[in-house]
Design a protein with these regions (language model features):
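Structured, acidic catalytic/metal-binding patches in enzyme active sites
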Residues: 34-38, 48-246
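A short catalytic or substrate-binding loop motif that flags glycine-/basic-rich loops and adjacent residues
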Residues: 42-45
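Bacterial N-terminal signal peptides that target proteins for export
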Residues: 2-15
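C-terminal motif of bacterial Sec signal peptides marking the signal peptidase cleavage site
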Residues: 23-24
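Signal peptide processing junction and immediate N-terminal pro/mature segment
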Residues: 28-34
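A cross-kingdom marker for long, charged
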Residues: 247-309
Length: 309
């Protein structure tokens, strides 16, 4: 989800409460495309950047796994990412920011009840202490916020704010400056409906789970960032499994949305090239966007990339 409203890192529950058809022959896209655009395919799947082609597409599109934070390390991506972003006709993000009503969005983050009514005294003190120590915010001042969104404040503090915008929003700003068309895969209301399908108590459990991690907050943040920039989707899956908690959460926030994303990507204009930025947690797995697109008849190939150190 978009970082300002959820900041669910990798779309996982803890520090994230704030990611089989393959054409046997060459795709319909001429080989000249990859030569012209200056990239080569990766020997393995340790990459966040993927080419989507075939199945009637006149131009290739590109799928890029993002992480919704402002830490400068995740902005040190390969120049080919910038090149393909510039090449694409359309930038697609999870939610088109132009379609969000800020007042409505703010209301969606609030609940009628008070978080005090869901926490024991010990839980309240623990969460209040953590929030104040790491963000300077007292729980009392945000007690009417849905617990799911309290993680956004926690995540922003843990992952650092070197850059002005989170990664996906930075691409959005660049697209707007260059008058590139921007679209969204999902609607804001769809993501909020997913949040509201989790009970307040379940949301609180996700917040409290993150406080009980054996790693320090700094170690948690470093581990997540390092896993992300490694581009290793298998390691990403392992990290997700460490935190994903209840199967209900994974189904609602990852699997169901993966299917919706793949369906809508498949409906894109075949004459246009899209640069599609979605949370990295949506890429891997049997029901990840990559495999779902392959099942729809697209050729989805890993592009060789690296991060600058």
């Amino acid at each position: 989800m978009y970082q300002k409203f959820s900041k669910t890192i990798f779309n996982k529950p803890a520090w994230i409460c704030a990611v089989l058809f393959i054409a046997a022959c060459a795709s319909n896209i001429p080989k000249a495309w990859d030569k012209e655009l200056g990239y080569s395919y990766a020997d393995n799947e340790n990459t966040l950047l993927w080419e989507i082609s075939g199945n009637g597409l006149k131009k290739p599109s590109y799928l890029y796994g993002t992480i919704h934070i402002k830490n400068k390390k995740v902005f040190q991506y390969d120049t080919i990412v910038t090149h393909l972003f510039n090449y694409a006709d359309i930038y697609t993000m999870e939610i088109n920011m132009d379609e969000i009503n800020p007042i409505k969005a703010a209301k969606c983050m609030m609940m009628e009840d008070d978080i005090k009514n869901y926490l024991s005294e010990a839980e309240y003190m623990m969460l209040d202490s953590f929030l104040y120590a790491n963000t300077g915010t007292k729980l009392e001042t945000i007690r009417k916020q849905k617990p799911f969104f309290i993680t956004s404040l926690m995540a922003e503090s843990l992952f650092g704010g070197d850059m002005k915008f989170a990664l996906d929003l930075d691409f959005y700003m660049k697209a707007k400056m260059n008058k590139k068309e921007v679209t969204g895969i999902e609607k804001f209301e769809e993501q909020m409906a997913a949040v509201d399908s989790i009970t307040i108590r379940e949301q609180i459990e996700l917040v409290l789970e993150s406080l009980n991690d054996t790693l320090s907050p700094t170690e948690q943040a470093d581990k997540m960032i390092n896993t992300y920039i490694s581009g290793n989707l298998n390691d990403l899956m392992v990290l997700m499994n460490d935190y994903k908690g209840k199967e209900k959460f994974e189904r609602i926030f990852i699997i169901n949305r993966n299917h919706r994303m793949a369906d809508r990507i498949s409906e894109n204009n075949p004459a246009k090239s899209y640069f599609i930025a979605i949370g990295a947690a949506h890429l891997p797995g049997k029901e990840g966007v990559i495999e779902l697109l392959k099942k729809k008849g697209f050729s989805v190939k890993p592009i060789k990339t690296s991060f600058n150190k």
